[in-house]
């Protein structure tokens, strides 16, 4: 009678092969000599480098707010506040130790400065003030553009240079500005737009659509990666200093409104620049 292998024979063979495979695996060898994982410092005061969004508004239709907190090892902090009608619904700790999501409920909260207290298990604390502003008007009171409007789309950098002093900003990655080079920044800015608003009204334009004016702080690589167009955002809450300031942007919009011009704010949310902290 022929003796056929039984199931137990195959199991023994499989276990032997698996054992040999593990012994010879490069991964096994690497793991045996790998450096220990970095121990995060949970004893120092929490490092709160940045909070996004930079401020928010009371009496929004949706009272919930997500704060993205950035700082070294901030993942391990707890967060509390004693501001009236501000409730911390939850904390979400991400894979990265340097981010923490804080979900707030602002139902009934009045405008003011919220003290957010970040604390570690050793009792050390960091307090950050977070501004809750009053809304100028409800969203339902704002009128957007429609089919009756004549839109003029433009790149501010390519329109008019009203303030040559902001062509190059010390400390920014891109230090190049040259109108003779097609791929570099040319120096156009918000002040240049403000000085020529009558040009648009004379054309019969009723709405201006600016390509993004938010910060695009990355190297131009001699024009290979220039961001004069504005589509490589590195800060969603700051106008690029080479265009002007947040205050100048608001002033421009107010002046446009006085002249019967609407302003479309172009913002890119499906991607950001590769120099953004995210």
What kind of feature is each model-predicted range?
Residues 268-270:
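Catalytic metal-binding/acid-base residues of hydrolase active sites
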Residues 60-122:
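Immunoglobulin-like IPT/TIG beta-sandwich domains and homologous Ig-like subdomains
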Residues 123-242, 246-262, 272, 277:
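N-terminal structural segment of carbohydrate-active enzymes
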């Amino acid at each position: 009678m022929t003796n056929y292998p039984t199931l137990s024979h195959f199991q023994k063979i499989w276990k032997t092969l698996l054992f040999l495979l593990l012994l010879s695996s490069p991964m096994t060898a690497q793991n045996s000599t790998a450096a220990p994982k970095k121990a995060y410092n949970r004893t120092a005061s929490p490092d709160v480098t940045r909070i996004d969004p930079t401020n928010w508004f009371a009496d929004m239709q949706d009272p919930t707010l997500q704060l993205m907190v950035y700082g070294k090892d901030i993942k391990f902090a707890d967060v509390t506040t004693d501001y009236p009608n501000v409730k911390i619904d939850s904390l979400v700790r991400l894979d990265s130790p340097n981010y923490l999501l804080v979900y707030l409920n602002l139902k009934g909260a009045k405008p003011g400065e919220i003290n957010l207290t970040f604390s570690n298990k050793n009792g050390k604390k960091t307090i950050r003030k977070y501004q809750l502003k009053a809304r100028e008007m409800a969203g339902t009171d704002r009128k957007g553009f429609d089919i009756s409007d004549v839109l003029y789309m433009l790149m501010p950098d390519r329109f008019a240079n009203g303030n040559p002093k902001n062509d190059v900003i010390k400390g920014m990655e891109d230090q190049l500005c040259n109108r003779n080079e097609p791929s570099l920044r040319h120096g156009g800015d918000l002040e240049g737009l403000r000085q020529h608003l009558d040009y648009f009204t004379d054309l019969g334009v009723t709405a201006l659509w600016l390509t993004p004016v938010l910060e695009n702080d990355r190297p131009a690589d001699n024009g290979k990666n220039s961001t004069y167009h504005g589509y490589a955002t590195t800060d969603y809450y700051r106008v690029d200093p080479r265009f002007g300031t947040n205050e100048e942007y608001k002033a421009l919009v107010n002046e446009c409104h006085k002249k019967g011009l609407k302003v479309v704010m172009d913002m890119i949310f499906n991607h950001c620049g590769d120099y953004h902290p995210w």
